[in-house]
Amino acid sequence: MIQNEVSATHGSTKKGITYNTILEAAQRPTPLVPLKKLKVEHQLQSDIYVKLEYLNIAGSLEDRTADKAFQFAEEIGVVRGDEVFVTAGGSAAISYATVAAVKGIKLTIYAPKGEFDLVDTVLHTLGVKTVELPFGTFAEARVQTDEAAQQKGVFSLNKFTTNAAFVANLQKTALEIEKAVNNKSIGKVGAVVIPLNTGAAAAGIAAYYKGIGEHGVRVVGVTCKKDTIPEMGLDLKNDLLQEYNVEKREVEEDEAYSFTRHLIGTEGIMAGPSSGAAVLEAIKLAKELPAGSTIVVVLMDGIRNYLRHFLDDDWITANKKDVVTRKDGPQPNSIYDPKVLVYDPTKLAGEWTQDPETKSWSHSEVEFNKFNPERPLVLDTVLDAIGKTPLVKLQHIPKAHGVKCNVYVKCEYMNAGGSTKDRIAKRMVEIAEKTGKPGKLVPGVTLIEPTSGNTGIGLSLASAVRGYKCIITMPKKMSKEKSIAMASLGSTIIRTPNEAGFDSPHSHIGVALRLKSEIQDAVVLDQYCNPGNPLAHYEETAEEIIYDMGDKHIDLVVLTAGTGGTVTGISRKIHERIPTAKVVGVDPHGSILAGPAETDIDFYEVEGIGYDFLPGTLDTSAIDYWAKSHDKESFLMARELIRSEGILCGGSSGCAVHYALEECKSLNLPAEANVVVLLPDGIRNYITKFLDDDWMNERHFLDA
């Protein structure tokens, strides 16, 4: 049950929310975002809003169906530990696997040939068994699944899946849309457009409008002419579509791929191809409807499953798709003035000052934002989907590791761009737009940023929305998934040698400085020195933690450290508001953030944490003490979080949780103690890394 608490301990009278499982966080409505740029580009007289279903807990609209299907199964006696079979592929398979992980169900998923190709690594990590059948249709696969379940004497979820999709979207998706109408956040809906997978979701939405007497609302389902786009048209229930008057429209595969890439780069909507196809048809529909109409597009899923698919230029070329590939961006000149490399990343811009009485902080150059805990149903842009991430209590892992206290994790991978770095990217851009520091931002200007990846994704997202060009310099060890995610948002990516120190002209910092000197009016926001980095976490992240914990006293906060902005900003706010709480920073062996200043280890695999210098954004005095981390334990814990709790987190998240549990045991924290751990990002960027058994085995991380 969701816990609603009144925060007495921390001085607030408002209610905060924590969730007992990640599945409870699925009850949060997904936001609506208007497509402003595309409206102008296509000279539309109607408004199109997209519903960001990829911000669900497992990344798709199918999460709603999977949750409801298991609820139906539990009502007839399925319990934790039972074995269940289901037929599903693609994003739906991940949704069922995630719900099964949370509920402790032993799940076997059957699917036609090829339906696991984009998701098999994630499914394996979630602990489900997959059976690929030599059939071409889901109808045939369902028959085989049901027969196999009957022979083994286990439950087949197939009897509920269609009804679950219908009911979940009738009771939740459609209702969330109508709440936005009732709140006058959007105009009366004239049409809802949705990708057709089975069609049951579209039928459920149509049934909702029919049930409330809104017979004028058109529900339009979109499918692919040749059934070649993932998540589209492979398992249609045409009888349902006819019964509830769902219109069908078709798109060409290559047209959908091209448009979806354009949608991502123009609006920052990180959607999968079926979602892009639906938006494309919504634009065509908008030209048919009366001026002033409102169209809502329900997005099926996001980019996670497609980073080695239609978003990858290599895949486009290999599969001979009629899609324009990206052009190479600028490279720094080989001859440069050494003076451009004069730079000190250890000095923070401006000064922080603490009031000796209130203990609150201020900054000499930046006006602070007031914290607002509300999560609107309708956002101005996708950048407003950054923040307000859920705080979830771990149910199984602490006990399995001998920890008595309560451990809550803040799921930052549910930010719009997929990580906690979205926050600092947004804040640094806001500050530059308002103050002109560290450079003036106007549409068309070039942002350049050296980063390990996640800040680059956040800045690429902000640049797409705000109309800036973006160049990201990044070490080669960072995943290809990160590079493709940034490129899909319109950024140019330049890779640099892993071994190059920060002061080398060939490092990601050195290359960024050289490019800045060569590109007119280019701006380096500089996450290592920019006050917006710690400020984003002081103003927002820490406030969210305190607000959501309510009257549950916080004893310990555990944070991984990279640029230092996260640990500095959160620690300052926590110490200001809860003086008795302790904050622990986690730093990998091979990094010098927590010391020693010199180390024999010069390489570590966990991405996004640690550095070979002390950034200006890091205030080491704000941290009570440090823990040094190892790769193996970090990755194994991340996998355990995925499999045992259904929390689809990245390697640095595993790092934070592993060392949080070690600290809980070291301190012998009692059952009533509360620990908060921040999970920086999710699995999207690491599917070919720590989620892959071969990658883990090559590094001996799976050795006993």
UniProtKB/Swiss-Prot annotation:
SUPFAM superfamilies: Tryptophan synthase beta subunit-like PLP-dependent enzymes. GO terms for biological process: cysteine biosynthetic process from serine; sulfur compound biosynthetic process. The keyword Chaperone does not apply. Changing residue 421 to A: Binds significantly less of the PLP cofactor. Altered fluorescence-based tryptophan spectra. Its cofactor is pyridoxal 5'-phosphate. It is found in: Cytoplasm. Keywords: Amino-acid biosynthesis, Cysteine biosynthesis, Cytoplasm, Lyase, Pyridoxal phosphate. This is Cystathionine beta-synthase cbs-1. It comes from Caenorhabditis elegans.
